[in-house]
Amino acid sequence: MPSLFSSLKFFCFSPTKDTSDKKIKDEILKKIEVNGGTVQYCIQKFSTNYIILCNGLDEYDRDQHYYNFQSNSLLFLEKSKSLGIPILSYKFINDCIGKNLIINDLQGYKISNIIDETIIKFEYQEPEEEIKEIQEIQEIQEIQEIQEIQEAYDDFFDLFGLDSAPIADGDVFKNMPPISQVLAEKAKEEKENQEKQEKERQEKEKKEKEKSKFKSTYISDRKLAMNQKTSPTTTSYFDNEIDDKENINNNDDDFDIDEIDFNLFSNIDLEINEKPIEEDFNLFNIGHYDDNVNRNIKTKSKFDNLNNKIKNNGYIFQFVNKDVSLYHEKDFPNNFKSIKLFEQSSKGLSCMITEDNRCYIWGNIKSNQKVEQLADHYQVDYCSVGGSHSVMIKRGIHTVGLNKFGQLGYKNGNTNCIGGGGNNKLMIENQIQRSISIINQNFLKKVLMVSCGKDFNVLLTNEGQVFSWGKNDQGQLGLGNSDSKENYEIKLVNFDDPYDSNSNKFISFISCGGNHSIAIESNSSTDGNCRLYGWGSNSQGQIGEKYSSVPILIKNQDQKSFNWKSPLVLCTQDTTIVVETPLKCTTFGVKFNSFLMNLKENFQDLTQFDIVVLKKRIGVLVYDEYLKASFLLRSLNYNENYHYQLIKLIIESNKFQHSHAVKLAKDCCEYGNLKVFKLLEHKFPLNLIDPVTLESPIHYSTLFNNNHLKSKIILEYCLINKIYSIDQLNKQKETPLHYCSRFGNYEIATILLVRGCNRNLKDVQGQTPLHISVSQTNHQLSSLLCKHGAQSIPDKTMKNPLQYCSADIKSNLQNILFTNEVFISYAHKDSEFVNNLRSNFGLFSLRCWLDEYRLQAGCNWRAEITRGVVNSDVVVFVISETSINSLWCRKELKMSKKLGKVIIPIFLQSVQIDPILYGLFTFIPKTTKKTFKEMSEKEVISNVSSISNLIHSILNGTQDSKLLTIQQQQQQNFEKSVQSLSRKEFFDKCYLNDKNSGCYLLFNNADRILFDFICDKFKENSIPTISSDEIIGRPSDQDDQFSLFNLMKQKKQNSIQRKKNIELEKKLKLENDEKLKQQWKIKRKIEKKLEKSKLIPSDPNYQYLENYLIQLYNFKNDNENEINENENNNNNQNNQNNQNNIIQNNYNYNNNNNYYDDNDIPILNNNFNSSELNNNYFSSSTTIQIEDSYNNNNNQAIYYDDGKTSEEEFYKQLLIEKENEKYHSIQPLKEFIKNSLLMCILFTRKTTKTEIEKYCLQIEYAKSFKDEKGNQDKTIIVITPDLSLKDNQNTPSIIKDLVWYEIDSKNIDLIFENITLMYEVLEKTLQISNLVNNNK
């Protein structure tokens, strides 16, 4: 038979480690295994069927089970909800086994919630009927409790003379009928008396300011009683104060808080003896605190952590994943400005100090009990809340709440303490102190801050000392012991090292968790770093590695203290968070990784925020002006009225600066908040541009692709109102369209294109938006750009966008790019107007072809222009003074006319047009009184709109016939008026064309690429050029040594020569090695000969024999080498004369061999002469006679036909012949040099010495021409890519004296604009001089 749980898998856990829970768990595990079930040791998503809770109790007191309690219960609950696996009571297993079946109805066993507070409570899912009964019982009990507490509240209000204020939402007193009636009546009275109350309050404040200063002294209950007996004025003061307070109501109708003035506790005008308190009444053995006494208090710089915490004002936010929201603003007073300090316990008991130092306290003490919301407490310095109590600092220590462990500062059950109207106290079960009590009147040290734990408190004085009181069962007071007794007396926490008598710890900041405390010691080392001390519970490692009931130094893994500089410290229930910077955070205990990650992403330094403990999570109290406004704007619970008003207050304040506005404008674009953006624009008109990046709000609107619908709101507002330029450039010369291409924002790019942005502006890298979109592989956006006029312009690497595309995308974009509806013909002087014209045409979906973007250096510009005219349907000619005289513009128009294109002129300037040019136009737009140059921007757009409509009608084949008739009549009338002019008058109105024109170019063949580029630039500027290529003819690739063919050939020859050199080096090395080998052999032979001679080294014959042998063998070796060399020479037939010498040397060598044998000692002949061993060398001298090619004979005469002899003419003819001989090499060029207006020399580092000589010769010839006044007639300039060549010593002075122009990628347009202007001046001058000469 199959087992009951055979197919089921269970995961079991118990909430504590107690023996009772452990026993239940073991029994359940055995029962599951016996019945065939599988026990798992972790929850698995797809296999676990049930999660079983093995609990002996339904509620666990954390104080009793603290060390045995396991904190995984809440994690199991969250995991069960996320995976959909139910958590059941162990009774489910017992009932299933008892009934022998799997129970399907789980309502009676399911755990619906786990309440993790002081009591760990497991709530079960009750059946529906039982739930209804329980709800009815709970309602009855709540009504009874409300009625009982209602009476106590009425007594409380009567005692304090206060009206019962409305209670916050969720309060158990909310539904009390008597209070609601009283509230309604009081609300009416407050509205009627509002103005009167305001005047009274203002008068009272003036009186308080006029009062003389006095010292405040806190005394014990016993001392106060004595003074009351002797001073009747004291009693009357309290009575009057209470009576006066009855008339003071909260003027703000929206406040849900009762008001208690802290002046009741501080500014008490008593006649008190200033003598020291007697010992009987001095409960803490501390004398009076005198403000004038010098207590050697350290400087306030020690309290940097505390000062940063209390000097700023802000708002509280909480992170929800990566989003942010304003924290529970409904629980706060409705009209407070901002928060200085905020704390909240896990039960919801909260305290807050606002910007005007008012203190508010509200929230739960237990699940069914709440402290009434206390109103503004003036001049409160500090406050803190624990689990069920609160402590405030205001010239003393004030407490309120539960006093189970003496955490209020007095013995449990004692209600006889001063404050809030004498001894009148209200108690509501379990020692809950509902009114504020002043404790420890004789504690006369100045308190700077206080921090509350769960049931204990720690305070810090201005002397850097720490005191504590309250519960101490886990050593949380730092007194060196742990007990469960009441510790209501304030005691000093000792930080001194018992082994170091000089140790004197100065504490600057404190923070308390659930049952542990942390203190910061400032400037504890010479490097200015801070050190952390901790004590109390260490259940989760929140104070380091070990538990301690006294302060211990928190160390790292290397047992060294951490090095922090003014860190931000916060303690939660079982965690210590230390933040040195938002990027450098350390946690001890339970981790909060997501919260720390949000800190890193949203903050830069600690001055911008503080960390606060909220009921269910950790929040941030934001101080930074920008971050406050930004978080409000980004808040998930954003309210158009409430949040907007808070943001408005922030923006209108003086603290809100321009840098804040720039960043907030970016947030407005991201979240589409136009109202806040208008606020920013109102305060900083036209000044929301980032001063660092130069980004405008139009740039910001392109950054958020996911929120393009929200960004669109800000974008259209800026464009419609023309607040910022649509082509605003940032620091990298990027426009908003560049940003759209980079971030793929198709929707925003469409808006920018429709609004007429410039499609072809380049950034610093020379890239257009089309470059970027193609490189981002955004084909949809690339096609959009091409359809709206983006051109294929090269970047700085001379690559156009199509070169970055794949083959299929490239063909698609090419089809779009080369289908241009409009071809614009213009002069380059009018390029600024033409760019605007192209942009305006783009507004009406017309693509335009411009040579500025199509023609590049090295391309076939004739073919490109021809392709542009052929692929277009309409040609627009821009008429100006320059364009009507441009030869290239006329050629373009003539070609368009031949191809049958429609030609439409646009009058940029009012000029007279000759009939030939006029006859090329197809349409003449309606003439206006103004030219385009004289029109405003709106008028230009209006006229372009009409021309665009005409072009669209032509493209669609629906042009207006009436328009044609009018234009034909205009053309006929114009032709008639032209025919009435005489031929001479017509030519007088036209520019004269003379043969003396153009620019003569000199260049080196090595610079042919640069020369071609310069020629194209001259042609773009309508300057005719001529060079040796046109005169002599461009050399072929084989004749040109710098052609690609010859360069490759030279490279190949160099490679062959390199190989030969390597082989030669190897051969020489072998020969050298052989030579060394021969020398070694000779040496060995000589040594052997000497050994055979049996001569000793001291013998004179030994030395003679040794020298003889060395000379003999060397001679033999030299002759052998010479023979080999001569044989090689003989084979090559290089030298015939050396052959006889070789034979003679061989003969001498053979004769010398008769005198010795290699194996014997040589026989010395008496007739031996060493001179016979020498070689005889013959030399001959060659005499070269140089004859003069020209013999100048002064005595010789020249005879002419007339028979006369003229010595003067002879010398003149001689000079002419010499000049002709000097310029003979440039004979073909002389005529063109003479007829040119401008002479341009290309001079680079590749220019050879020969070319420089040619340059000098041609320059000298050009300078030989003089005008009538004897001045130089030719203008000569030098173009160079390197201006330092002008100062080079190798550059001839005749070239140095000329005008030099340096060209590079940045100023090339400006250089040629200047050259063009120079040429036009020369041309005009020539025309005027020709006219003058013709008139003569």
Curated annotation (Swiss-Prot):
Molecular function per GO: NAD+ nucleosidase activity, cyclic ADP-ribose generating
All copies of domain BRCT, residue ranges: 1-110
Keywords: ANK repeat, Coiled coil, Hydrolase, NAD, Repeat
Induction: Down-regulated by Pseudomonas aeruginosa, PAO1 strain and up-regulated by PA14 strain infection.
Coiled coil location: 179-218, 1047-1084
Active site feature: E892
ANK repeats: 732-761, 765-795
UniProt cross-references to InterPro entries, sorted A to Z: Ankyrin_rpt, Ankyrin_rpt-contain_sf, BRCT_dom, BRCT_dom_sf, Ran_GTPase-activating, RCC1/BLIP-II, Reg_chr_condens, TIR_dom
PROSITE patterns per record: ANK_REP_REGION, ANK_REPEAT, BRCT, RCC1_2, RCC1_3, TIR
Pfam families in the record: Ank_2, RCC1, TIR_2
Extent of the RCC1 repeats: 412-462, 463-522, 529-581
A biological process from GO: defense response to bacterium
Record bears the keyword NAD: yes
Region (Disordered): 186-213, 1120-1140
GO CC term, one of those recorded: cytoplasm
UniProt feature, compositional bias: Low complexity: 1126-1140
Disruption phenotype: Mutant S cells are killed by an avirulent Legionella strain that does not kill wild-type Dictyostelium. These results indicate that, although TirA is not required for S cell differentiation, it is critical for the effective response of S cells to bacteria. Show growth attenuation correlated with a discernable loss of cell viability. In addition, tirA mutant cells appeared to be more sensitive to killing by Legionella.
Domain spans labelled TIR: 818-935
EC number(s) per entry: 3.2.2.6
Catalytic reaction list: NAD(+) + H2O = ADP-D-ribose + nicotinamide + H(+)
Keyword Repeat: yes
Free-text note regarding domains: The TIR domain mediates NAD(+) hydrolase (NADase) activity. Self-association of TIR domains is required for NADase activity.
Free-text function comment from the UniProt entry: May regulate responses to pathogens. Required by to respond appropriately to bacteria during vegetative foraging.
Protein name listed in UniProt: Protein tirA
